[in-house]
């Protein structure tokens, strides 16, 4: 045996192969406290399956997708401006898991997911996000945008728009699914959305939208929800309206906007975020004029909690990795978890991790009561 091979025996294992549900006793206790027994009997086997995927196939796919980020192809071979985005097959397989097998985008909007006769309560959605993110972080942004976009559409869109778009937005068949994106940010309008400059002008039964959106995640989604200012609207956030912009027009042609480039990001590398220029893009008003900020704020609580869940999930993954090393790394004749200073460091990780878990479990539970 070579010296290099012998040295490898000293390296502690990582979380590969771990079931993130099975090892999380805090999560299991919270589920028992907040979910009724009949619902637990339905969802816990699925949570266990996702937990196993999180430390297995999903983790493998995530690593591959991060090494092979999406690629923008501005034109086709004939010179047509199509701005197609090429995703690695690993990303497409993760989409199949999230949208297809686990229906994470729609479980709170349709009956029958996993055989449960009602739409799932919000807490179930957040638990699935928590387990999924421990294996893959980037894709949960598009999944969450689809979920909150469905909430907005169901509450605010006209019956005509609902009939046209909701069936495919609610699908879990990847050949039928229309994914959702939300284009809000501009160069001068990040947190201060009142600075939005993208303009919309009425044209018959639709609107034509012009301007630049600066940070557009899930840039090649089939359905886009965006904020724009109509002609003559007041300045600031009170003059913003919400529009649905389809990727393709009714005649099958591409809508009039361009994905100018993709962002070179430090994180969420698997998911395509881009800069978009709208040049007379066809859009449809959602709700009443000048109520866009009110509409989007109604989904902000969902998004905020989702971001908290993602943070809790990453904290848990980091804790799992630390525990795995501490329990298996041997120094001075014993596993380093036996050393008091190591235990102290682990406790400094463990306490806020359990607090984050407890926070989102409680908040997700009372969200159903608030609704």
What are these regions (language model features)?
Residues 1-117:
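Extended, charge-enriched "interface" segments that sit outside catalytic cores
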Residues 117, 251-256, 260, 272-303, ...:
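A glycine-rich, basic-preceded beta-loop-alpha segment at the flavin cofactor/substrate interface
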Residues 83-176, 217-219, 357:
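Internal helix-loop-helix
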Residues 206, 210-254:
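A short core secondary-structure module
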Residues 188-191, 215-217, 234, 265-271:
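Short Gly/Pro-enriched turn/cap motifs at secondary-structure boundaries
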Residues 157-198, 202-205, 361-371:
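Internal maturation/activation junctions in enzymes
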Residues 304-370:
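Extended amphipathic alpha-helical segments enriched in small hydrophobics
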Residues 35-58, 117, 123, 140-163, ...:
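N-terminal leader/propeptide and maturation segments of large enzyme subunits in energy/redox metabolism
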């Amino acid at each position: 045996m070579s010296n290099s091979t012998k040295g490898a025996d000293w390296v502690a294992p990582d979380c590969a192969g771990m079931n993130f549900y099975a090892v999380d006793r805090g999560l299991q206790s919270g589920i028992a406290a907040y979910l009724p027994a009949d619902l637990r009997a339905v969802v816990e086997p699925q949570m266990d399956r996702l937990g196993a995927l999180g430390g297995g196939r999903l983790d493998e796919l995530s690593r591959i997708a991060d090494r092979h980020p999406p690629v923008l192809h501005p034109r086709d071979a004939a010179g047509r401006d199509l701005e197609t985005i090429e995703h690695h097959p690993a990303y497409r397989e993760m989409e199949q898991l999230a949208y297809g097998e686990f229906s994470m985008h729609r479980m709170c909007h349709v009956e029958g997911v996993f055989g449960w006769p009602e739409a799932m309560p919000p807490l179930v959605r957040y638990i699935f996000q928590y387990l999924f993110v421990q294996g893959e972080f980037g894709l949960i942004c598009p999944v969450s945008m689809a979920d909150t976009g469905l909430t907005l559409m169901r509450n605010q869109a006209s019956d005509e728009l609902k009939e046209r778009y909701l069936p495919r937005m609610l699908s879990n068949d990847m050949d039928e699914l229309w994914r959702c994106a939300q284009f809000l940010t501009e160069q001068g309008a990040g947190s201060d959305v009142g600075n939005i400059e993208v303009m919309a002008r009425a044209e018959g039964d639709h609107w034509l939208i012009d301007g630049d959106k600066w940070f557009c995640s899930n840039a090649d989604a089939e359905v886009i929800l965006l904020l724009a200012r109509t002609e003559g609207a007041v300045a600031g956030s009170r003059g913003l309206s919400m529009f649905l912009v389809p990727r393709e027009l009714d005649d099958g042609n591409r809508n009039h906007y361009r994905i100018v480039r993709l962002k070179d990001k430090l994180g969420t590398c698997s998911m395509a975020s881009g800069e978009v220029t709208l040049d007379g893009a066809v859009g449809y008003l959602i709700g009443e004029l000048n109520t866009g900020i009110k509409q989007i704020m109604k989904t902000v609580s969902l998004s905020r909690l989702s971001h908290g869940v993602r943070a809790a999930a990453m904290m848990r993954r980091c804790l799992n990795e630390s525990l795995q090393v501490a329990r298996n790394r041997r120094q001075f004749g014993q596993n380093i978890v036996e050393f008091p200073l190591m235990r102290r460091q682990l406790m400094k990780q463990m306490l806020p991790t359990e607090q984050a878990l407890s926070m989102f479990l409680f908040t997700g539970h009372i969200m159903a009561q608030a609704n």
